[in-house]
UniProtKB/Swiss-Prot annotation:
This is Glycerol-3-phosphate dehydrogenase [NAD(P)+]. The gene is gpsA. Its EC number is 1.1.1.94. The keyword NADP applies. Pathway: Membrane lipid metabolism; glycerophospholipid metabolism. The keyword Ligase does not apply. GO terms for molecular function: glycerol-3-phosphate dehydrogenase [NAD(P)+] activity; NAD binding. It comes from the Bacteria. It is an enzyme of class 1 (oxidoreductase). One of its GO terms (biological process) is glycerophospholipid biosynthetic process.
């Protein structure tokens, strides 16, 4: 079997996992989608769509739904994990007994480890050792647009160049899904995780009616925060100007398809965090990532004023307008 035709298993049947499964199977190559809920998997297999998250988008013929985790893992050497960051470690532990030397592990989860602020790469290496090639897939992608076949570009980061090229060839589709490769896994992971925090700030600003100027300032200073933290952890600063950095940040901060932006808008309008998350009805990664990003910045001794103020709002009871005042009242400095 050629590299391009080799199967891929996607672990996680939420909106983004399903969208990636649809995109990767459009080229006719075998793709498997596993979800933790057997009833939901049976419904998807029967209806040939994910009616809950992506209604009216039919599954390509090459996409098969798997409810048995062992079977799903054994069907492919390439495993693409697409689950919320707070259950990522649990999924790694669940697949561990089924792994063989041939397996390669990729994730599109955007976040940091709950409670520690560690990169997900560190979690994987601690749980599984260094025997499996690793990669991370990240960039400006909304699930609905990706599933609908609209043009999308994304970054695939791996330290093993051969693995990166092989998986790029497997998932790249010139018609709608363009994949760039990068060797900076640290930078790509951080860009995907912390952009959600900045998106909350941009949403808060818009919710308070501060306008486009303020939103743009938050995006610009936000990428500066992410870059400072990334460089302190060994990332390449140029990574943050790419798809997984600035690209993902701009998308998430400016379009209402972003849950994190919508969450921030509700905060800016005076809605409390729990009510806002309940109304959105899906995981708001930025809520969880804010605490971890703040912890990581403190550990590294990096100044991240936007992240700090969002942390104060979410976890210390600070009013959104007070947070905005604190940012605007900071001492003038050279850019």
């Amino acid at each position: 079997m050629s590299i391009q035709a080799s199967p891929v298993t996607i672990l996680g049947a939420g909106s983004y996992g399903t969208a990636l499964a649809i995109a990767l199977s459009r080229n006719g190559y075998p793709t498997y989608l596993w979800g933790h809920n057997p009833t939901a998997c049976a419904q998807m297999a029967q209806e040939r769509q994910n009616a809950r998250f992506l209604p009216d988008i039919s599954f390509p013929e090459a996409l098969r739904v798997e409810s048995d985790l062992k079977s799903a893992v054994e069907k492919s050497k390439d495993l693409l994990i697409v689950v919320p960051s707070h259950v990522f470690g649990e999924v790694i532990q669940q697949i561990k007994p089924f792994l063989h030397n041939r397996h390669r592990i990729i994730w599109a989860t955007k976040g940091l480890e709950r409670g520690t602020g560690r990169l997900l790469q560190n979690l994987v290496e601690q749980e599984l050792g260094s025997q499996y090639p690793l990669a991370v897939l990240s960039g400006p992608t909304f699930a609905k647009e990706l599933a609908a076949g609209l043009p999308t570009a994304i970054t695939l980061a791996a330290e093993n160049e051969q693995f990166a090229k092989e998986f790029q060839a497997r998932i790249h589709c010139s018609k709608h899904f363009r994949v760039y490769i990068n060797n900076d896994m640290v930078g790509v992971q951080l860009g995907g995780a912390i952009k959600n925090v900045i998106a909350i700030s941009a949403g808060m600003s818009d919710g308070m009616g501060f306008g486009a100027n303020a939103r743009t300032a938050l995006i610009t200073r936000g990428i500066a925060e992410i870059s400072r933290l990334g460089v302190s952890l060994g990332a390449n600063v140029n990574t943050f100007m790419g798809m997984s950095g600035l690209g993902d940040l701009v998308l998430t901060c400016t379009d209402n398809q972003s849950r994190n932006r919508r969450f921030g808008m509700m905060l800016g309008q005076g809605v409390d965090a729990r009510t806002a998350m309940d109304e959105i009805g899906q995981v708001v990664e930025g809520y969880y990532n804010t605490k971890e990003a703040y912890m990581l910045a403190q550990k590294q001794g990096i100044e991240m004023p936007i992240t700090e103020q969002i942390y104060q709002v979410l976890f210390c009871g600070k009013d959104a307008k007070e947070a905005a005042t604190a940012l605007l009242g900071r001492k003038s400095k050279v850019e």
